[in-house]
Amino acid sequence: EFTDIERLVADTHSERDYLIEQVVEKMRSELENRSIDAEIVGRPKHFFGIWKKMKKQQKTFEELYDVLAIRVIIDSNMDKNYCELNADPDTQKCYEVMGLVHALFKPIPGRFKDYIAMPKPNNYQSLHTAVVGPKGKPVEIQIRTRRMHHVAEYGIAAHWAYKEAGDSVVA
């Protein structure tokens, strides 16, 4: 079964890359039109992650919503020292971008999670949604600020060390 998933993921890799690129380009164009500075990264999920999720959720490959995943990281035009842990100046932009995503692509009901208003216990913050992408394929989209991304990737302790060191630390 694992090798079947591996083969299915490998067989659909180029199509998934193409679909992700279509969504990324459409979003990039709209964000530029609205002068929102953001990094948009798309990635097809690795087969082992897909297999684990299928097992855990008892779903088929086609039923998963995050086989195609895109992350939008909003960059601040504000001074980085201004960004305090609970005072991220770009938080509102996350919701603006979410509205834009839902205007560009049909949202999938029940697939929106607001971890900004309700952070996870480890202080993870992000907006998650799933939308109907090209060819009717579901696409998971995560939206967060650069500060939220840093906390998500490196943890809250690393975020504070980064803030204390200023811009001299590259993370």
Features from the language model and the residues they span:
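Nucleic-acid processing machinery
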Residues: E1-A171
